[in-house]
């Protein structure tokens, strides 16, 4: 069960989502109004608005939803904000994985990897793999384990990814992430801390894999110890 914080607490989703959006923007993961973040606390689901400058989101601009995906609290602002286009995809993670947070990035590394791979991104024998949790066993992957991130095809509208993402999550029960070709990536976990750690590790591994490819190095080295 997630901790319940007062609105004044820095880890309350109303404060945490804007902070994480700024960090994602600085990393190039949420530029041009792209990307999104959702965090669950108690019975409520907090979601950043759509089509706004992610580095400038304020606590009073967050939507609050219930488990039925109904908005129970509108942003406390006069701005005419629209709920994130990612909302039904975030709820895939909540409903199918019991996640506590789901993060969506438009990282260039994710897009490039989706172009280099067919149906999956696979990599092993890299230390940062240890920072990713097997979604089924809830245990961290080991150095010799293979990280597998499945890839789905992009659509014209974000909401139209909902069904294919859900089907992919069923086919890959161990994965905590789904790549969307030519688009970005969704990552989830039990807590926002674990989801943040996972997306950082996966993006690092993807960036490394791109460089390895230019050097002729294998992502899954045969006979490696």
From Swiss-Prot:
One of its GO terms (cellular component) is cytoplasm. The keyword Lyase applies. It comes from Leishmania infantum. Transmembrane segments: none annotated. Catalyzes the dehydration of methylthioribulose-1-phosphate (MTRu-1-P) into 2,3-diketo-5-methylthiopentyl-1-phosphate (DK-MTP-1-P). This is Probable methylthioribulose-1-phosphate dehydratase. Zn(2+) binds at residues 104, 106, 183. Substrate binds at residue 86. Pfam families: Aldolase_II. Pathway: Amino-acid biosynthesis; L-methionine biosynthesis via salvage pathway; L-methionine from S-methyl-5-thio-alpha-D-ribose 1-phosphate: step 2/6.
């Amino acid at each position: 069960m997630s901790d319940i914080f007062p609105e004044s607490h820095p880890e309350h989703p109303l404060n945490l989502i804007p902070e994480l959006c700024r960090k994602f923007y600085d990393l190039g993961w949420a530029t041009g109004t792209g990307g999104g973040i959702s965090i669950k606390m108690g019975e409520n689901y907090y979601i950043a608005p759509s089509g706004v400058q992610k580095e400038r989101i304020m606590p009073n601009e967050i939507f609050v939803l219930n488990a039925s995906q109904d908005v129970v609290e509108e942003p406390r602002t006069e701005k005419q904000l629209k709920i994130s286009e990612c909302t039904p995809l975030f709820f895939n993670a909540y409903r199918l994985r019991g996640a506590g947070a789901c993060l969506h990035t438009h990282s260039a590394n994710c897009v490039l990897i989706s172009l280099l791979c067919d149906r999956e991104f696979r990599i092993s024998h890299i230390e940062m793999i240890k920072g990713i949790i097997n979604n089924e066993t809830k245990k961290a992957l080991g150095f010799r384990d293979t990280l597998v991130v499945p890839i789905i095809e992009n659509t014209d509208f974000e909401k139209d990814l909902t069904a294919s993402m859900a089907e992919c999550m069923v086919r890959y029960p161990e994965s905590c992430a789904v790549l969307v070709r030519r688009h970005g990536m969704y990552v989830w976990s039990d807590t926002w801390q674990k989801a943040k750690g996972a997306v950082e590790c996966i993006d690092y591994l993807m960036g490394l894999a791109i460089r390895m490819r230019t050097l002729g190095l294998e992502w899954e080295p045969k006979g490696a110890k």
